C-alpha cells in the first residue's frame, strides 16, 4: 500500500517538474521514497465536495517496491472497483478507503506503458454514497517525471 504524503515525517522535495507531472523524494522511517504525481486537469461533478485527486507512481527501494501505481479521487471509495481509461485501454483498480491500486505487478507494467504513450487518462470511481466521480488527467510530462523518480531511487 502507498503511504500518503500526510504520513511522511519529512516534507517531500521536488526532484523536477515536467509539464503536468512532478517527481518527489522523501526520507521515511523505512528509507528513501520517490514518486511521480499529477493532479487532474478536470474534475466532475463540481457539486461533490472532495479533497485533492492524484495519480502516483511510487518507488520504495528498501521495501523492494517499484512502479506502484495508486490513485486517490479525494473521497472514500464505495466498496467497488475504480476504472482508468485511455482510448481503447481499460484498467480496473481495487479500492480501500480513499486509495485504489492495481492488482499485481503485471498490470502495473502494462499501465506504465499506457501512461507513457497516452495523452490523457480518465479515472472513474464511486463515493461511499454511490455518486460517480470522474477525473481527467493529462499525461504530458509523465515519462520524464517517471524516469526521474525511478533514477533517484535506483
Question: What is the predicted function of each stretch?
Answer:
Residues 3-9:
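Sec/Tat signal peptide C-region and signal peptidase I cleavage site
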Residues 9-154:
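A generic "folded-domain core" signal
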